[in-house]
Amino acid sequence: MARKKPRELYAWIAKNHDASSIALCCAALGVRREGYYDWQKRPCRRERDEALVSALKEVRDEHPAYGVRSMIEALSERLKPSYGKGYIICREYGLLQKRRKPHGITKANPKALPAEDLLKGDFKSETPNTKWLTDITEMKCLDGKLYLCAVLDCFDASIVGFSMDINMKTPLCTSALNSAVKRYGKTEGLIVHSDRGSQFTSHLFRETLANKGFRQSMGRTGNCFDNARMESFFATLKKDLIYRLPVYKMNRAEVRHYIFEWTETYYNRKRRHTSNEQNLPPLVKRKLFQEQIQAAA
């Protein structure tokens, strides 16, 4: 049985010490008497900490993949602790997230000529639709694998387009790109960055980019950090949704529905992003940007 925390033992002593002396209770439970008296002198702080723990647990339930900073930002101003205290409480109460090492599933075509890396690790953008990232991930479902290709805008980390299919051939990627263009239009010279997977070096994908006036950019082979923000999105998707569902017991149509709903109603509209000013959700930041442009016109 796990040993109780000192504060829990102090609370028991405070409730039950009438039957015997405080010194005897402390000795029996293996805690310091001075610690008990110090604990008694800080009821206001205890109440604040209890309220903070309760609030952090609520944030974790609503946002399973939030890091400590985002959890703190989601709290009301009166409860916000320092990062150090927030981290200690999250660690003590099991609210920290375990990180999984990202791994790519695309394979490079050794005969294809890769595009130049135009981003060189710079995933920031001051305006929408100037830098898009794209990649593929997979989910193992009851009736086989489901593949997702998504397009992320570096401006606000929003998913501007995505496509799902039972295979990871090039049309999966062109479909995701076309869905982004359908939603936000074409911006001449827009950079589309990916890894060196054969889907992205294919004639069909490159022709699609050229027809839209887009520029292609590629990271190094086998280096996930060259497309880190895209990998981060897939990690968030899996922590928030996929790892919390019995995907292996669900058919692809069900999983497809969950991914669509999570992306459109939660990730783009509600989930805070530390990469955005004031940790704004993606489409909230985009809306504010558009309002500022209109006000300045």
Regions found by a protein language model. Name each.
Residues 2-7, 26, 33-127, 223, ...:
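Basic, flexible linker segments flanking DNA-binding modules
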Residues 1-29:
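Helical coiled-coil/dimerization "stalks"
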Residues 45, 65, 78-79, 124-125, ...:
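Conserved, non-catalytic sequence blocks in retroelement Pol enzymes and Pol-derived host proteins
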Residues 106-110, 194-196, 202-205, 216-239, ...:
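RNase H-like two-metal-ion nuclease catalytic core shared by retroviral integrases
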Residues 25-26, 36, 56, 71, ...:
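Mobile genetic element proteins and their domesticated derivatives, centered on retroelements
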Residues 140, 162-185:
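Active-site beta-loop-alpha junctions of metal-dependent nucleic acid enzymes
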Residues 121, 125-160, 166-168:
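An active-site-proximal beta-strand-loop segment
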Residues 210-214, 238-297:
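C-terminal domain-tail junction helix/linker
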